[in-house]
């Protein structure tokens, strides 16, 4: 769950419920609290919704304001991510030291039968790397407009997997489940190429929660998934680049 959006929702609920009669409600707000149990008046509830959507620049978004706080936070996260990654995020492939076009040669050295680009964006590597499949839930230039969690059910293995700034958001557990699904799809002897931007907040994406990747985190994941952390580099902008290799 996106902790930034969760905090925003809680703070706005506390403002909307800032009356003595709601003291018991506000003191017990948590992600499993349901809107139906709050007893908030229709006028205050409508104002709360308007404030959230205006703050997040999602005025036209349709949200089901019912059920748990967590379910509403997840809806807001999906709507905001769709807008941000589909309309705002414009990567400049040429500027990345280790995972720009230089990555093409690294992948080709493997002579891969199949390559998966996770969070491919505009699918820029499609024409440069043979046998590449690009997936991205937010961009219709991808081969399949799905998340890695959905795509992991396919009966297919890839000799190389690219994840450039895509497995980089929300909590440690969110990272873990996505990495686990990538690992399931990676063929024996294959490699996963990562770029992550720990703590680098996009100026136009204040509600995107960036995960704090580090060497220690990458090392621990390699150990957990029985992979080799083959390479770990960092550029002058604190972006981190690393390669996981699966034993043959």
Region locations from a protein language model:
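A short SAM/SAH-binding and catalytic strip from SAM-dependent methyltransferases
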Residues: 160-173
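Thiotemplate assembly-line natural product biosynthesis machinery
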Residues: 1-27
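Phosphopantetheinylated carrier protein domains
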Residues: 42-67
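Class I (Rossmann-like) S-adenosyl-L-methionine-dependent methyltransferase catalytic domain
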Residues: 65-67, 77-152, 191-248
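4′-phosphopantetheine-dependent carrier domains
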Residues: 19-20, 25-27, 46-52, 72
């Amino acid at each position: 769950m996106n902790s930034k959006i969760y905090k925003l929702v809680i703070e706005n609920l506390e403002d909307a419920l800032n009356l003595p009669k709601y003291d018991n409600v506000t003191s017990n707000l948590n992600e499993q609290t349901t809107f139906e149990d709050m007893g908030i008046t229709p006028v205050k509830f409508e104002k709360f919704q308007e404030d959230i959507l205006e703050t997040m620049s999602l005025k036209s978004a349709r949200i089901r304001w019912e059920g748990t706080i967590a379910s509403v936070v997840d809806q807001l996260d999906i709507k905001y991510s769709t807008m941000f990654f589909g309309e705002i995020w414009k990567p400049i492939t040429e500027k990345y030291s280790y995972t720009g076009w230089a990555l093409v040669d690294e992948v080709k050295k493997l002579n891969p039968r199949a390559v998966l680009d996770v969070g491919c964006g505009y699918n820029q590597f499609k024409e440069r790397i043979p046998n590449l499949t690009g997936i991205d839930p937010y961009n219709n230039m991808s081969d399949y407009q799905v998340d890695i969690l959905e795509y992991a059910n396919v009966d297919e293995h890839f000799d190389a997997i690219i994840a450039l700034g895509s497995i980089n958001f929300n909590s440690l557990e969110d990272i873990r489940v996505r990495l686990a699904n990538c690992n399931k799809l990676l063929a024996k002897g294959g490699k996963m190429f990562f770029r992550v931007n720990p703590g680098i907040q996009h100026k136009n994406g204040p509600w995107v929660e960036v995960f704090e990747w580090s060497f220690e985190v990458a090392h621990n994941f390699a150990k957990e998934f029985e992979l080799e952390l083959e390479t770990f580099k960092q550029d002058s902008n604190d972006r981190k680049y690393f390669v996981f290799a699966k034993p043959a």
